Each structure stands twice: as C-alpha cells, then as structure tokens.
Amino acid sequence: KVVMRRPISKGFFVSIDKADGNPLSAMDVARVKQRMTEVVEEKTPFHRHEVQIEEAIDVFRKLGHMDKVKLLESCGEVYISYYTLGDTADYYYDVLVPDAGYLKVWDLTPYRDGAILRVPDRHKPEQLAPFIEQPKTFDVFAETIRWNRIMGLDNVGDVNQACIDGKATDLIQVAEALQEKKIVQIAEEIFSRYKSPQKVRIVLITGPTSSGKSTFCKRLSVQLKACGLHPVSFSTDDYFVNRLDTPKLPDGSYDFDNFDTVDHAALQKDVLKLISGETVEVPEYNFVTGIREYNGKKLALEEGSILLIEGLHALNPKLLDNIPDSEKFRIFINTITSISLDDHNCIPTSDNRLLRRIVRDFNKGAFTAQETISNWPNVRRAEVKWIYPYQEDADVLFNSAYLVEFAVLRSHAERILATVPKNCPEYSEAHRLEKFLHYFVYVSDKQIPPTSLMRYFIG
C-alpha cells in the first residue's frame, strides 16, 4: 500500500506498507523507482473517465480503495472524473498530463521509514527542487499523524463520516485540547529555561501569514502566567518604517514582507533597554497613515517578566544579533496539514492559510477575494525568502492546522469565492478552491471557542 503523506523537503513524503509486514528497505524503494521509470519510458497514457459518482465508487470499492469510497460517498457530487494508467484506476482532483512520458524530472529516494518523491523546481522545472532536510517539521507531522490514527482518522472521508455521525463537536474539542496541551508544554519549557543559569529572557514567535501568530501569542501568555511568569509582548509590525521608507519591489509596489520593512535597529535598541531594566516607550504603527507613532505606550520588565516578540521576522538572526542566543526561545508556527483527501491526494499546506486569509480579509473589509488571490503569489515568494529559511532554527514548532478546519471554513469561504468575477485571472484559483471545499461536509462554527486560533479568521 502506497500513501502520499504530505509535502515536505521540497518533495512529498511517501509511506509504503509491504504485504509481508516487513520494514521498507532501500532495495524496495529502488524496485518501485525502476517500475516508475519503465512507465515513464513507455509513455503510458493517462485516460480520463467522467462518470456518475456511483460508478466511480463501485470501481474503487472493487479495488479495495476504501479511502476513495469514503471520500466520494460523502462529497455530495453527482458526476466525477477518475483516471486510468494502464490497468490501474485512481482518482486525482486536478488535471493530469496526457501521458507519463511528460514526467521527465523526478526521483524517489529512501527517507526515514518511507521515501521522498522529489519533483521539479517550480521556478526551474528542468531540474529537481533542492532537497532540504526538515527533521523538526517531519517530527511535528509524525506526531499529528499518530494522533489522527488514535482517533481513526486517516483521510477526509473518515473526518466527513465522523461529522455525519454527529461527532463534529468531539473532533473540535479534541483538536482544541491537543493544541492547548502543546501550548502548556511550550510554556513549561520556557519557564524551565527561564529558571536555568542561561535564563531565557525573550520568546520570539514567527510563522507565515495566517498561521495564527497573534492568537497563539495571547494563549501562550495565559499559560506563562499560569507558570508564574509575567509576559510582556509587542509585535514587530509596530516597528515598521514609515511607508515612504518602505522597500519596493521591481514593479514599484511596496515590499511589505521585506526584512528592512522593520526598523530592526530601533527594535533591538529598545529590547536591549528592556532587558537591562529600563522603561521604554514603544511605538504603535498607524496602518492608515503609514506612520510609526509614539502615543505614550510604555513597557518594562520586572522580576519574573519575560518578553514576547511576535512577527514575520522574529526568527531572523539579524533582528536581535547583539543578544546571546541562550537568552532567546524561538517558536515557529505553521499549518502542517496531516489529513489528506485520500491515500494519493495530499492537501497543499498553503491552502489552509490562503482560505483563512481570504475569509479574514473579506470579513474585515481589507481586501476582496480577488485581491487576496492576486497578491498570494507575492506573499508565498516572500515567505520562501524571508520566513521559511529559519523554520528549522526554532526551539519548538507549533502546528496550528485544525482537524475540521476546511469543513468549518467552507460555509464562510464559498460565498466569498463566489464574488470573484469569471472574466478575471484569479477566477481559476477561486474555482479550484471552491471545488476543493466540496470534498468537505459543512460543520458549524458555533462550537469553535472564542479563544480558538480559528476564531480569529472566521470572526
């Protein structure tokens, strides 16, 4: 049994369960790779079959692909398309190339207890994307998979069925409990290091856009108080340079994600004063006027205080390069999606955040869905350049992905995505997201607690 688990290390982690139950060996991976190579060299065609969903369900039931049966039974569609490659029938929710001969740039290499399927670099498709070791990210993913298995949830079909059976509230409560448990563990680790001879003084919190940094910071503050500490916090956003001084992209638009958007010299100067015992007046950035203002907000670190700094560039080593690393505790927040549509269809990790941002931007009147989608490629490029390089430097990685997230987001996102005009370039992405959301049953947000990371995005 082959399962595409998730995107990682610029490729996809694949688990391969052998029929004899023995561990996967490098020789096993080599044999799978050889068969894949043969299929590519033979230019075996992909055939698309559009049928009524009952027919597709029957095909996959006979093949024993119950992951696909559960997904298709619960998605509510009337017609569906599936593909065949030779004698092998499978399902893919997007479009495939005409034949396997198009797949010239790839590799399959052993990794941990499975393999990594390496794919082309999206910017240089004639060569493989560079392999980037991500042990901490993989460990978070493995931990989430373990909890999913304990609850009997391998794929979206399992989650849908649980919701249909009236267990959505249970899933929400378990998801909240697991996140709170992790936050408690992080707070206790910070407290332990605060009491150590090196004495951690600063907690740095970062993550890509819409990962839940602000809400996480608030919830961590509560748990730090429960440990007996007095958290004092601010955001790097308040140290943005005035808009006229903001770096620009080649097209002349503002590069708001650039590291130099933050006045890191002023920020570091204030942090050094704070940890030296001084009282500091910190700025508040006015996003309407684009000016950093000083309105009398003062911070001070007393006995038992610990400083929390949250923002996109919080883990950039240049931000506080005059402060010893031993005094810093780094936290990276990401949405590491552990649930797949089925055994062969992963969910892109960025889809969580894009949908969160579309809903949040629209509800707050900041941007339309079309504008958010249009700007998303720039956001992703900035994350790859400025944020993700420091992910593995974190002391702790926190997964803010929510087990029933897409089911909760569906009712919010569908009406917003429907506002994207059909005659604009962003419509294809809006349509893809709408189609993707159809795989999830509706789950009401009424059971989402007010302190939930999800609540910040859905209101």
Feature locations, PLM:
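Conserved glycine(s) of the Walker
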Residues: 212
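Hydrophobic anchor at the beta1->P-loop junction of P-loop NTPases
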Residues: 203-205
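P-loop (Walker A) phosphate-binding loop of NTP-binding proteins
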Residues: 208
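Auxiliary tRNA-acceptor-end handling modules of aminoacyl-tRNA synthetases
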Residues: 2-181, 186, 191-194
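Conserved NTP phosphate-binding and transfer environment spanning the P-loop NTPase/kinase superfamily
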Residues: 194, 320-459
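Conserved nucleotide-sensing/catalytic segment adjacent to the nucleotide-binding pocket
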Residues: 232-234, 241-290, 306
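Post-Walker A helix-loop "phosphate-sensing" segment adjacent to the P-loop in P-loop NTPases
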Residues: 222-232
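Hydrophobic positions on the alpha1 helix immediately C-terminal to the Walker A/P-loop
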Residues: 215-220
